[in-house]
Amino acid sequence: MDFYITKEEIVSSLNATLGVVEKRQTLPILANVLFEVDESTLRLTATDLESEISTISTISNFKSGGRTTAPAKKLSELCRLFKEGDEIHFFLDGDNLKIETSSGKYNLSTLPSEDFPVFEKEEGGNTVNITGPNLKALIYKTSFAMGNQDWRHYLNGLYISVEDNNITSVATDAHRLALSLIHI
């Protein structure tokens, strides 16, 4: 794996994935982000085994593809320190991810990409298109009633149903009940 990417691209992608990087580190691999590189794109994936976020960024110069994992928090903190507009060179050297910029050379330990848990993608499932603002409104209008770290895990989430061109979201903490409906 050997490629170049701008600071802005990598920082944006890392920031998007940091929300699901495991903080308790029950498994060391969950503190890492998965790198997948092909001719024109970098896919970063992070998971906490409940949620998974993947981002796709455009790379500026491709030398070789590949897969690896690197510590998400350390990588994010490091990339934020680079100069605006910097082009960052990432490449694998054995079990290490080497990073070179105009300001210096850095080295991060990696874990094998084969150990990274990836959700199975369902083929041929039903899909629903919804705008970002509509989804945000749907969640906002019901999320206040969700349980927060309740021992009854089924109360800690949001129920979403799609029927007859309507999307309904429902949440409860056993004391409050919230329902929101959007026509699509």
Labelled PLM ranges:
Residues 1-182:
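Structural preference for solvent-exposed beta-strand-turn elements
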